[in-house]
Amino acid sequence: ANSVCFTFTDFESGQQDLIFQGDASVGSNKALQLTKVDSKGNPQGGSVGRALYTAPIRLWQSSSLVASFETTFTFSISQGSSTPAAALTFFIASPDTKIPSGSGGRLLGLFGSSNNAGSDNGVVAVEFDTYPNTDIGDPNYRHIGIDVNSIRSKAASKWDWQNGKTATAHISYNSASKRLSVVSSYPNSSPVVVSFDVELNNVGPPDVRVGFSATTGQYTQTNNILAWSFRSSLMGYQAN
C-alpha cells in the first residue's frame, strides 16, 4: 500500500497482525514482552526476541518516490541484574527478515556476528542501549543510536535510562530532506534527540517490515513495548 497507518493501544496474545520471533510474546499486562521473563516477571539471560507488523510496507518505488513515515511508541526497561543489558530497538528490514544466528546480546537480534558491518542486510534501526560495548564502537555511556546496516551507530546521543519508568519515543523520516530523527523522553525529563541523514532507497528493498527487537545477555532487563502507532505515506518528489 502507498500509505499505511496502524495503532496498538495495547497488545493481545495471539495477535494476528504481528509476527513474533524468538522469545517475544504478549504478557498478562498486555505489553509486548520482547525478551523472556519467568513466571514472576523476572528477566532471563541470553534472550532474543522480535515482533514485526505483519503487512509489508512500501518504503520506496524509485529514487524519486520514497515514503516519509513516523512512529511513536511507549516502552519500559527494568533491570533484572545489578547492571541492565542489553538493548531494545525499533527497526526496518526486508520482509523475509529472521533473527540472525549469533545475534544475541550486543548484536541486538539484528546482526549476526558475520554481518555486523555488512552493507547487504538492509537494516535500519534505532537502538536504546543500556549496556555500552565500547569494543564494537559504542560510546562509553548509555545511549540512543541510529544504525544503518551495521552495529556501529552512525549517530548517537547520551541517554539517561530510568529503571522501570515509561519512556516515549517518536521516530520520523522525511523523504525530502532524507533525515531520520529520533526524540525520546521520560516524564519530567529533557528529551534526547538523535538524527542522521540516510537515503532509505539505497539501504534496503522497496518493501520492508517494521518492528522491534531486544536482547539480554549475561546481565538482564525486561524489554516491554506498551503501545505503538505508525504511519507512512509514499510521496513523489525530485530526488538527486
Swiss-Prot record:
This is Lectin. SUPFAM superfamilies: Concanavalin A-like lectins/glucanases. The keyword Protein transport does not apply. Heterotetramer of two alpha and two beta chains; disulfide bond linked. One of its GO terms (molecular function) is carbohydrate binding. Binds preferentially to oligosaccharides bearing the sequence Man-alpha-1->2 Man-alpha-1->6 Man-alpha-1->6Man found in early steps of glycoprotein processing in the endoplasmic reticulum. It binds weakly to highly processed oligosaccharide structures. It holds the Pfam family Lectin_legB. Binds one manganese (or another transition metal) ion and one calcium ion. The metal ions are essential for the saccharide-binding and cell-agglutinating activities. Belongs to the leguminous lectin family. Ca(2+) binds at residues 129, 131, 133, 138. PANTHER family: CONCANAVALIN A-LIKE LECTIN FAMILY PROTEIN, LEGUME LECTIN DOMAIN-CONTAINING PROTEIN. The keyword Manganese applies.
